[in-house]
Amino acid sequence: MTFPVEKVRADFPILQREVNGLPLAYLDSAASAQKPNQVIDAESAFYRHGYAAVHRGIHTLSAQATESMENVRKQASRFINARSAEELIFVRGTTEGINLVANSWGAENIRAGDNIIISEMEHHANIVPWQMLCERKGAELRVIPLNPDGTLRLEVLATLFDDRTRLLAITHVSNVLGTENPLPEMIAQARQHGAKVLVDGAQAVMHHAVDVQALDCDFYVFSGHKLYGPTGIGILYVKEALLQEMPPWEGGGSMIATVSLAQGTTWAKAPWRFEAGTPNTGGIIGLGAAIDYVASLGLDKIGDYEQMLMHYALEQLAQVPDIRLYGPAQRLGVIAFNLGKHHAYDVGSFLDNYGIAVRTGHHCAMPLMAWYGVPAMCRASLAMYNTYEEVDRLVAGLTRIYRLLG
């Protein structure tokens, strides 16, 4: 069955606009995906007809808003096949989710002389929190190096584990290279040494189904805005046994059971003790609509279409003179490249003149840029609403830039 890309595109109003007098070719979904009408309408309807502060309210609007919010928690739980909805914490996004783990579980479990393993391809969000934690605790941060093709040197990973390894924090899919890491193999190694595993799933959940129980990871985190949902909302999954032991990171309303000036404070049960303050309820409603939307299309069908588009794009881009493509042949979502000796910003600016939106810069992955010896890369990302025609426009634009700049 052919993927209904034109029908999908019709659901995204922004794709109807022009940039610099040309139809928009939006190839930057790995930074943030566009939103379908179904998400926009769901969040708008909530604010128009159903908004109220959640929790503890006895009036109808508050009770309905609370029920809607908790239904999305259940929905997101099914989306990643968690054992229980109470293993999911609403966070602002992947970055906050990782920081929560570092400042709650990490603060309690990392000691001087321990070590944490990450990789050279990580987003800064999965580097900096662990650097900060290791500096505070006197722990060591160990790094899995890269192969030239953009995959990880797994033979080195085996040498990094020891009996003081407490955590493997690894990206599911690289936001620059598109590399999908072999999580089952890596998690199995971590288990042999008693280490916990955190997976940054920000670049994975929109491309194929994720099953956290099958993966057997301890933490899994992703953002809504890359999944065609609103900004400012994400999901942190934590295995229940770990979650019950973790102390809260932020204090305030909604995360307490009792507060006494004389006797101190007791916490609400998990996951609510990790959700201090008024939540982004509108964003949560929008996230639920986004999950519904991709589920209605079928993640397997989305993935199949995106893979066909990716193979075509890699074949066509390889024909552009003086282009350098980064990453493995088999990848998800993104294509990073440079054109000759021209700075990525210049190439991206020319493409913008042609109505083509790509991301340029270090992509919050400075260690990866350093490994490749470049200050920046261009990155085109492919989503379910992108087309073969847009790939052709990208290739034609790069060829034109080459001819103009040499």
From Swiss-Prot:
Its cofactor is pyridoxal 5'-phosphate. Keywords: Cytoplasm, Lyase, Pyridoxal phosphate, Transferase. It comes from the Bacteria. CDD domains: SufS_like. Gene3D superfamilies: Aspartate Aminotransferase, domain 1, Type I PLP-dependent aspartate aminotransferase-like (Major domain). GO terms for biological process: cysteine metabolic process. The modification N6-(pyridoxal phosphate)lysine is found at K226. Pfam families: Aminotran_5. It is found in: Cytoplasm. The keyword Lyase applies. Pathway: Cofactor biosynthesis; iron-sulfur cluster biosynthesis. Its EC number is 2.8.1.7, 4.4.1.16. It catalyses: (sulfur carrier)-H + L-cysteine = (sulfur carrier)-SH + L-alanine; L-selenocysteine + AH2 = hydrogenselenide + L-alanine + A + H(+). GO terms for cellular component: cytoplasm. The active site is at C364. One of its GO terms (molecular function) is pyridoxal phosphate binding. Cysteine desulfurases mobilize the sulfur from L-cysteine to yield L-alanine, an essential step in sulfur metabolism for biosynthesis of a variety of sulfur-containing biomolecules. Component of the suf operon, which is activated and required under specific conditions such as oxidative stress and iron limitation. Acts as a potent selenocysteine lyase in vitro, that mobilizes selenium from L-selenocysteine. Selenocysteine lyase activity is however unsure in vivo. HAMAP family: SufS_aminotrans_5. Homodimer. Interacts with SufE and the SufBCD complex composed of SufB, SufC and SufD. The interaction with SufE is required to mediate the direct transfer of the sulfur atom from the S-sulfanylcysteine. This is Cysteine desulfurase.
